[in-house]
Amino acid sequence: MLSKTHIMFIPFPAQGHMSPMMQFAKRLAWKGVRITIVLPAQIRDSMQITNSLINTECISFDFDKDDGMPYSMQAYMGVVKLKVTNKLSDLLEKQKTNGYPVNLLVVDSLYPSRVEMCHQLGVKGAPFFTHSCAVGAIYYNAHLGKLKIPPEEGLTSVSLPSIPLLGRDDLPIIRTGTFPDLFEHLGNQFSDLDKADWIFFNTFDKLENEEAKWLSSQWPITSIGPLIPSMYLDKQLPNDKGNGINLYKADVGSCIKWLDAKDPGSVVYASFGSVKHNFGDDYMDEVAWGLLHSKYNFIWVVIEPERTKLSSDFLAEAEEKGLIVSWCPQLEVLSHKSIGSFMTHCGWNSTVEALSLGVPMVAVPQQFDQPVNAKYIVDVWQIGVRVPIGEDGVVLRGEVANCIKDVMEGEIGDELRGNALKWKGLAVEAMEKGGSSDKNIDEFISKLVSS
């Protein structure tokens, strides 16, 4: 019966959205569920998919040349939804004809009216959230009009159910850029959750106990994380060390060889995510010199469009202490014995990965949910420090260097490392056989099979 149970995944086509969904898919496949993941053709053709238990199908997201790229987020996602819905109907019929009818569609929460779309296609629907429960609660309260983002002038703190008191700088930052209605779209993630059959969050019960309970009082949410490869956690899935889905090629050999030559706990790993940073030239310069002035060895991921912001003087001085790469295998790096801290933008995936591997953090949040995650890193889980921002919105190199030193040495560093190791143990506990997330996944499968 289980082998006939078929789940189709529809990720949003970005590395930070596809990776956790792939981890969930791999775990379900290992437990005997048939899995198909639907990807844009342009992405599937250029990516590395490394799991033989995962079937793939393609959807084209090409926009008509005459129409161009829709200007508003609602218009853009409306076009995407139309293309997905039209193609999914054919894919579902194909799977049914092949003897593997789809029982459930797991759809990234960013897609509009996901549950409605699934039910119109005659299939159960489950939104998949790639941010924390805390951020979900904040976005939902903003969606209800109980909170404005960006906050009103004069607002210094915000009190919300299940959430610790938030300062103005702890709230999500929405840089609208191309899509001026982006925040409205983020709020609309909650528009049809009351109709969802399941709702998945990449978190675990002990990490966000109160936040998950509050969301559970609103909708049928299920905590299924931390979603990172099994060999870094519970080791139930044999040889599961890779993301399984990668948009970028990392020079694994040179990164690990460089780290192998360094003393245990002596290296700062710095990375600010898989999309273009919002750093101006001044900001980039302060981060760069802050790393150098900390006097610690560092490995820094600087994606290609950003590398031009690094001065020739910095690059020359960094040769002795630093390795600057365009991409690296983050999990392998974070788990390496030489890593002592992680300077991060506080994206949710990076936060969960560092916490699960017991690495304390230097928080440099930029936008979206990142300030909220930084608040939890520093004040709730107590596994990092946050670099203060100057009046002009730019960090100062001296503050960057001092924060690195706080995490890497002394009593503060010892306390942060101890807390990080505690959370690492709890992350493993959640995913090992009989752990909270493992049980949640098993109960979900059982209910799906019997429905």
Swiss-Prot record:
Pfam families reported for this sequence: UDPGT
Binding site for an anthocyanidin: H17
GO molecular function per UniProt: quercetin 3-O-glucosyltransferase activity; quercetin 7-O-glucosyltransferase activity; UDP-glycosyltransferase activity
EC number, UniProt record: 2.4.1.364
Induction text: Induced by methyl jasmonate (MeJA) in roots and leaves. Induced by A.niger mycelium-derived elicitor, thus improving ginsenosides production in adventitious roots culture.
Signal peptide region: none
Binding site for UDP-alpha-D-glucose: T130, Q330, H345, W348, N349, S350, E353, D369, Q370
Pathway entry: Secondary metabolite biosynthesis; terpenoid biosynthesis
Database matches in InterPro entries: UDP_glucos_trans
CDD domains associated with the record: GT1_Gtf-like
Role noted for this protein: Component of the dammarane-type triterpene saponins (e.g. PPD-type ginsenosides or panaxosides) biosynthetic pathway. Glycosyltransferase that catalyzes the biosynthesis of ginsenoside Rh2 from protopanaxadiol (PPD) and the conversion of compound K to ginsenoside F2.
Name of the protein this chain belongs to: UDP-glucosyltransferase 74AE2
Natural source organism: Panax ginseng
Gene name of the record: UGT74AE2
